[in-house]
């Protein structure tokens, strides 16, 4: 890793401290306020420099989209809370370490059954039941699922959140938005796996 400037080190330490204390990275505005930058844009430039040096990864689409590529000073603290899963690589276990963006200090027992991880929602296919783009979906890891449940399913190379309907050797994954057609899966010919069931939603704005 290339050496960091004094300012870059300050930004990195603030990111690490914030993640240890809150379970999530700071926003650009929070970085600017804490370190006395004139604007969030100045914080963004320092984040880009850290990303170029391989210390962090910038995740698009969220104000807290910062992933550390180095361990926190207190690894035990880092592991507290529910892991937040971002993009899932094809063929990789959903809870593989490289998929974990951060950890959120949420009591898993708040959900019934207990949540095992959080999944960042992309898109509005489930909006009619209140699962919106950018939300964090609490998921209980299980393969024991029934018709009508909202599941996290892996279809070939994609992970999707849909309502399950099993029909013999075929599965239908229904959206809760009339603009989306059901996904049909031929179990005899298409890779398919259940990763878990949805047990709750955290509105992403509540964490911003």
UniProtKB/Swiss-Prot annotation:
Name of the coding gene: lexA
Keyword Glycoprotein included in the entry's annotation: no
Record flagged with keyword Ligase: no
GO molecular function, one term: serine-type endopeptidase activity
Protein name: LexA repressor
Active site: 125, 162
Subunit structure: Homodimer.
Family (UniProt): Belongs to the peptidase S24 family.
E.C. number: 3.4.21.88
Record function comment: Represses a number of genes involved in the response to DNA damage (SOS response), including recA and lexA. In the presence of single-stranded DNA, RecA interacts with LexA causing an autocatalytic cleavage which disrupts the DNA-binding part of LexA, leading to derepression of the SOS regulon and eventually DNA repair.
Gene source species: Alteromonas mediterranea (strain DSM 17117 / CIP 110805 / LMG 28347 / Deep ecotype)
Disulfide topology: none
One matching Pfam family: LexA_DNA_bind
Residues of the DNA-binding region: 28-48
InterPro entries the UniProt entry points to: LexA, LexA-like, LexA/Signal_pep-like_sf, LexA_DNA-bd_dom, LexA_repressor, Peptidase_S24_LexA, Peptidase_S24_S26A/B/C, WH-like_DNA-bd_sf
UniProt-annotated site: Cleavage, residues: 90-91
Keyword annotations from UniProtKB, A to Z: Autocatalytic cleavage, DNA damage, DNA repair, DNA replication, DNA-binding, Hydrolase, Repressor, SOS response, Transcription, Transcription regulation
BP term (GO), one: DNA repair
Lineage, broadest ranks: Bacteria, Pseudomonadati, Pseudomonadota, Gammaproteobacteria, Alteromonadales
Catalytic reaction list: Hydrolysis of Ala-|-Gly bond in repressor LexA
């Amino acid at each position: 890793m290339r050496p960091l400037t004094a300012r870059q080190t300050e930004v990195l330490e603030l990111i690490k401290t914030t993640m240890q204390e809150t379970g999530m990275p700071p926003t650009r505005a929070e970085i600017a306020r804490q370190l006395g930058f004139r604007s969030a844009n100045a914080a963004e430039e320092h984040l880009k420099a850290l990303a170029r040096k391989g210390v962090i990864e910038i995740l698009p689409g969220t104000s807290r989209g910062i992933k550390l590529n180095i361990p926190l000073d207190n690894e035990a603290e880092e592991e507290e809370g529910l892991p937040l899963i971002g993009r899932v690589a094809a063929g990789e276990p959903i809870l593989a370490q490289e998929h974990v963006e951060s950890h959120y200090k949420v009591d898993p027992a708040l959900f019934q059954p207990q949540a095992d991880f959080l999944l960042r929602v992309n898109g509005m296919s489930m909006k009619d039941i209140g699962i919106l783009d950018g939300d964090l979906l609490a998921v209980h890891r299980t393969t024991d699922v029934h018709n009508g449940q909202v599941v996290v399913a892996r279809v070939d190379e994609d992970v999707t959140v849909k309502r399950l309907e099993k029909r013999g050797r075929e599965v239908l994954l229904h959206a809760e938005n009339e603009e989306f057609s059901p996904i049909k899966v031929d179990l005899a010919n298409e890779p398919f796996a259940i990763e878990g069931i949805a047990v709750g939603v955290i509105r992403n704005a509540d964490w911003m």
